Regions:
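Conserved, structured core segments of small domains
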Residues: 1-101
């Protein structure tokens, strides 16, 4: 199943890591381990952020996705299960509508 992981980086320690020249290597190490389907870095509420699409085969792996961001950046992580159009088609919405209407 696919999951969206939203990451918000506080200014510190990120700014210090940028000044030290180590932030790039830390992010590379995390991404090498995370292996996201895709990831985009952006601004979120005035701070740095990222949105990743991750394939989750085993829910017990979720801490391994977020802990590197928590421990290296004091970041906040949010998770949302995501469906493709094909997944949504398999959801049986018509039947659910009939059952619960």
């Amino acid at each position: 199943m696919r999951m969206l992981m939203n990451v918000r980086f506080p200014h510190e320690p990120f700014n210090t890591l940028v000044k030290e020249g180590t932030v790039g290597e830390i992010i590379r190490r995390i991404l090498d381990d995370l292996k996201p389907e895709s990831i985009y870095f952006t601004e979120q509420g005035g701070t740095r952020g990222a949105v990743a699409v991750i394939n989750v085969d085993d829910p017990s792996r979720i801490p391994s996705f977020s802990e590197p961001f928590y421990l290296n950046f004091n970041a906040d992580c949010e998770f949302r299960i995501a469906m493709s159009p094909e997944d949504l088609g398999k959801a049986g919405l018509d039947e659910l509508g009939k059952k619960w209407s």
